[in-house]
Amino acid sequence: MVSETTKSSPLHFVLFPFMAQGHMIPMVDIARLLAQRGVIITIVTTPHNAARFKNVLNRAIESGLPINLVQVKFPYLEAGLQEGQENIDSLDTMERMIPFFKAVNFLEEPVQKLIEEMNPRPSCLISDFCLPYTSKIAKKFNIPKILFHGMGCFCLLCMHVLRKNREILDNLKSDKELFTVPDFPDRVEFTRTQVPVETYVPAGDWKDIFDGMVEANETSYGVIVNSFQELEPAYAKDYKEVRSGKAWTIGPVSLCNKVGADKAERGNKSDIDQDECLKWLDSKKHGSVLYVCLGSICNLPLSQLKELGLGLEESQRPFIWVIRGWEKYKELVEWFSESGFEDRIQDRGLLIKGWSPQMLILSHPSVGGFLTHCGWNSTLEGITAGLPLLTWPLFADQFCNEKLVVEVLKAGVRSGVEQPMKWGEEEKIGVLVDKEGVKKAVEELMGESDDAKERRRRAKELGDSAHKAVEEGGSSHSNISFLLQDIMELAEPNN
């Protein structure tokens, strides 16, 4: 480990991950990357969330990395939540989302006391975009705050442009009308419902929550982005200009996981034995397996999940299908059994009911494609593994990420989903892609057409670039150095 901070006054970064699996995983990776450079790291979270990362962090600490995990009690009672509801994926209904965000902001007072007592004094706060209360703490103690969105530069720039041109969204005649994003490096079209909700949200509690996030974004010192310059060069350049030079692409941060245990155990413990999974993959032909995972907060209705399953079956290709939140899909379990689906696909399909060792699976040579919900972590992990993607966006930034992968990078195939899944309206929305559509998209991705071969070549090229970016001398490795230098200069007494 090469320290990039002085021994007399080491930098001390305090990290605040948002309590959602897709936000916490990269923040823990960022903690390890910074600690490898000699930065003292304190991660602030709640007991239930700390337990998810205990093993990964213990291994990091035992290896000599200066990481400390501090826990604060989550005020679930004060917000009207149930005990244990400390993470987005633990909420049983959409109605609990607003109380959850209120509970998060109740953490300001206990966290402020923590910061007051910290020794050494924090040099910098790195906070998730969804925790605007940290801006007040940064201002009170005059500590620079770096923001982490968990999105790529393409989406961040898109959100910035649309906030500045709000009238474009206001003037649309319907939610299905297409518009072109102005002042963008590439010509990209969306409908109003496909853009991230932070960009366009009606009045009410949600607007108040997002307005607080936007204000915190605009008052932060800078932004770190889990991406790399070679992936989206024009967007990284333009977004850095928007942030007055204070935007650093430091990814893919997942590549800090170099040993099998860390790859297999990111966040929740896997619900399949690692050796069993690898043995199954070893039995398949090189590049033949489609990995299917629609994220930690998949809200597809039963009717759509059935069509997805039947389409995978009819594709006649080997697949791994991860279904998270399995306990919520009892009817699907019954259908698997009663319809004979599980019996019919047992030699060709592997069902993982819960969490999977995603990085291990994606990096296995038998895997040749990834059907993803286009959450940024999964999108980037697929790209890093050099795999072409079959895109199935659900909500939030996911339609943005689909546009980047399919239209800009030319490394993916669309499933055909045109509208987001609204929480509470899933059954009303129903089936967006039938089994024939699924089968056709799988064939387009995994087949032997010239276009499919070109996508695979392009995906491998991007994967190689991702690995080079984090090596010494690579763009992301260098950007971490630039970030640390910037904060060191701020920490000097005369500054």
From Swiss-Prot:
Q: Which InterPro entries match?
A: UDP_glucos_trans (IPR002213), UDP_glycos_trans_CS (IPR035595)
Gene3D superfamilies (alphabetical): Glycogen Phosphorylase B (3.40.50.2000)
A molecular function GO annotation: glucosyltransferase activity
Q: What is its EC number?
A: 2.4.1.-
Q: Does the keyword field hold Nuclease? A: no
User: Membrane-spanning regions, if any?
Assistant: 146-162
Where is it located?
Membrane
The UniProt keyword set, sorted, is: Glycosyltransferase, Membrane, Transferase, Transmembrane, Transmembrane helix
Tissue pattern of expression reads: Elongating hypocotyls and root-specific. Expressed in the vascular system, in meristematic tissues of the root tip, and in the vasculature of the hypocotyl right after germination. In late stage of flower development, expressed in petals, and in abscission zones.
CDD domains listed in its UniProt record: GT1_Gtf-like
SUPFAM superfamilies attached here?
Answer: UDP-Glycosyltransferase/glycogen phosphorylase
- Region annotated Disordered sits at 446-477
Q: Where is the composition biased (Basic and acidic residues)?
A: 450-471
* One cellular component (GO) term of this entry: membrane
Question: Where on this chain does UDP-alpha-D-glucose bind?
Answer: 296, 356-358, 373-381, 395-398
Write down the Pfam families for this protein, in alphabetical order: UDPGT
Give the membrane topology.
Answer: Single-pass membrane protein
Q: Name one GO biological process term.
A: cellular response to hypoxia
* Main localisation: membrane
Q: Which top-rank group of organisms is this from?
A: Eukaryota
* Described function: Specifically catalyzes 23-O-glucosylation of brassinosteroids, resulting probably in their inactivation. Also, involved in the O-glucosylation of trans-zeatin and dihydrozeatin. Active in vitro on cis-zeatin, dihydrozeatin-9-N-Glc, and olomoucine. Possesses low quercetin 7-O-glucosyltransferase and 4'-O-glucosyltransferase activities in vitro.
Q: Which family does it belong to?
A: Belongs to the UDP-glycosyltransferase family.
Instruction: Please give the name of this protein.
Output: UDP-glycosyltransferase 73C5
Q: Which species is this record about? A: Arabidopsis thaliana
Per UniProt, what is the name of the gene that codes for the protein in this document?
Answer: UGT73C5
